[in-house]
């Protein structure tokens, strides 16, 4: 089964409780505390699932394979292929928030594949839970997505994932997860594969291990496979592919890890190694019956950025991996695991076009590379357009916003300037309202900081890719200008004190700066050059000690997402393991002015 839910509706927590209830957790896993599945540092920090995880739980005499899918639309590439491995889905919906855009996205994919459905209303212990309304929302959503009668009559459970309880009646609190396990077994049919037929397996996911190389993961449709057996790799979309190889290792999925095994049979979800060139969508077959299995084509990327070698004056001082070859190798390695990502060489040898499913998709990759010791610079994100019948089409987003009523006007004004069209508005109780918009994807670049300011941190924004539409015209993404350093050196209090009167600072005393580096922003919308390395000329009567009396306003450091949102079209982001620095593409002031005058 696959568990689908919106970001932060509690699916990883619920799966953890299911593993504990299955009582087959390894001793060393008990000590980690929580979130066994989110085993990537970034996932634990952000509370989101990026990669699909596979685990299994033994209940009675059944082995239930559970796949935890990402709820964020940017990782939709993961979701689509994972659904090929399952017989049914458990739809998890927050009892207060109800159905959100990403729930719709993944559920639509599941219904298209005619999978059995079980619905769980989670977090029923929330004080603002509205269980009856959420049940209606789920049924309306299913009807809207064209669910079959069987799918509309799916069982509904009421859960508290944190406590590990489930109940069939919202008024009767549950004591354990047995009702959930029993419902899953009675609703979702076991795999129908034939163990006697020739071996056939679809590769739905790949991993990489330094010791055994490429690892393929998938479900066996038919037959049995043993370690050392010869197989043929073929592909539904590439009829010419016929590649022979041997399975050197086989792994079975247990409570929270892979266990080596000698043979596997139809219906099992397994991992294997020994085929270095196998990729997602390939079929492994017995040499006696080479027949590829159909595979869903992944949606195209919608956003691109340019990753290039860091060429700033501070380049090479903080990172371990700084050359174009090292960056290229790392991006190629990411392609082995991430099907929604595309990488192409650009016009220059030291930069690469990296395309993904959204800003978050690419920012997770940048943050991961940064933590691994890579140093690089990236361009502002751009949308990927299509030309159809001579017209330019751009990606659109369906945006759902929950805000307190008093900030509704500010949000509607801000999004209206970004070409958003209001499609629906509904009241959520006495003091909150839900707004639904359709707008160009690029209109959301740089909007989150403005949204947090407009709603005083009380708004919730969610988005989902919503097809393509005709180019909507110019959108001004940023209203502020940049404070640009025109000296290279170390920022000092005296220089910063003078600069802060021109705008808001992003660097503090003692930080290294260079010519062309953005050290803050102005409210005017125009770039202003400042010298933050300027020291006071000392005389007998002007001592340096009086600098201590200068008061600097505390600075706010931007996160990686904040930096990407902040970038203007003529700026780049320098990413190192220790620092994030925003800079102009042309560092020299005179050359920058000449380039600007040519554009006019």
Label every PLM stretch briefly.
Residues 116, 126-186:
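Canonical P-loop GTPase G-domain recognition
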Residues 31-33, 145-157, 191-202, 239-253, ...:
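Interdomain boundary/hinge elements
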Residues 160, 346-361:
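Short glycine/threonine-rich beta-strand-turn micro-motifs
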Residues 224, 276-277, 356-362, 404-408, ...:
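Helix N-cap motif at beta-to-alpha junctions
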Residues 312-335, 549, 553:
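A short, contiguous, amphipathic alpha-helix enriched in charged residues
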């Amino acid at each position: 089964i696959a568990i689908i839910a919106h970001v932060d509706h509690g699916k990883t927590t619920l799966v953890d409780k299911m593993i504990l209830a299955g009582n087959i957790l390894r001793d060393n896993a008990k000590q980690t505390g929580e979130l066994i599945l989110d085993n990537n540092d970034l996932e634990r920090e952000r509370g989101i699932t990026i990669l699909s995880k596979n685990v299994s739980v033994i209940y009675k005499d059944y082995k239930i394979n559970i796949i935890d899918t990402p709820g964020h639309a940017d990782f939709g590439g993961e979701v689509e292929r994972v659904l090929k491995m399952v017989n049914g889905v458990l739809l998890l919906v927050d009892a207060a928030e109800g159905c959100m855009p990403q729930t719709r996205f993944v559920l639509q994919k599941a219904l298209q594949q005619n999978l059995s459905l079980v619905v769980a209303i989670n977090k029923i212990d929330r004080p603002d839970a509205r269980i009856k309304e959420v049940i209606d929302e789920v049924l309306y959503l299913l009807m809207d997505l064209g669910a079959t009668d069987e799918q509309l009559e799916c069982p509904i459970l009421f859960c508290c994932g944190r406590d590990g309880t489930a109940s069939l009646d919202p008024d009767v609190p549950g004591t354990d997860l047995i009702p959930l396990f029993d419902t899953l077994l009675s609703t979702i049919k076991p795999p129908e594969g034939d163990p006697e037929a020739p071996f056939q397996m679809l590769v739905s996911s790949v991993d990489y291990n330094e010791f055994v190389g490429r690892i393929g993961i998938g479900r066996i449709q038919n037959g049995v496979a043993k370690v050392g057996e010869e197989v043929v790799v073929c592909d539904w979309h590439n009829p010419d592919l016929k590649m022979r190889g041997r399975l050197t290792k086989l792994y079975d999925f247990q409570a929270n890890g892979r266990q080596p095994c000698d043979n596997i049979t139809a219906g099992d979800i397994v991992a294997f190694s020994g085929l270095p060139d196998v990729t997602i969508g390939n079929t492994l077959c017995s040499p006696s019956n080479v027949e590829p299995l159909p595979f869903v084509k992944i949606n195209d990327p919608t956003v691109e950025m340019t990753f290039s070698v860091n060429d700033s004056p501070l380049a090479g001082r903080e990172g371990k991996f700084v050359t174009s070859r090292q960056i290229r190798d790392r991006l190629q390695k990411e392609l082995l695991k991430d099907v929604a990502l595309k990488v192409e060489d650009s016009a220059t040898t030291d930069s690469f076009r990296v395309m993904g499913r959204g800003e978050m998709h690419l920012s997770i990759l940048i943050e991961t590379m940064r933590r691994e010791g890579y140093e690089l610079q990236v361009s502002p994100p751009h949308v990927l357009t299509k030309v159809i019948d001579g017209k330019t089409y751009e990606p659109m987003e369906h945006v759902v916003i929950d805000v307190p009523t008093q900030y509704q006007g500010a949000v509607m004004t801000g999004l209206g300037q970004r070409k958003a069209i209001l499609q629906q508005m509904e009241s959520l109780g006495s003091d909150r309202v839900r707004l639904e918009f359709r707008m160009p994807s690029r209109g959301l670049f740089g909007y989150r900081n403005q949204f947090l300011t407009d709603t005083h941190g009380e708004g919730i924004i969610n988005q989902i890719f919503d097809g393509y539409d005709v180019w909507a015209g110019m959108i001004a993404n940023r209203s502020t200008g940049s404070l640009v350093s025109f000296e290279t050196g170390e920022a000092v209090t005296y220089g910063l004190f003078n600069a802060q009167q021109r705008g808001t600072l992003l660097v503090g005393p003692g930080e290294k700066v260079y010519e062309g580096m953005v050290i803050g922003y102005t409210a005017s919308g125009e770039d202003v050059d400042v010298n933050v390395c300027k020291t006071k000329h000392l005389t007998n009567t002007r001592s340096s000690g009086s600098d201590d009396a200068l008061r600097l306003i505390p600075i706010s450091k931007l996160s990686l997402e904040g930096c990407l949102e902040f970038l203007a079209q003529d700026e780049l982001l320098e990413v190192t393991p220790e620092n994030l620095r925003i800079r102009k593409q042309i560092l020299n002031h005179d050359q920058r002015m000449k380039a600007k005058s040519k554009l006019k």
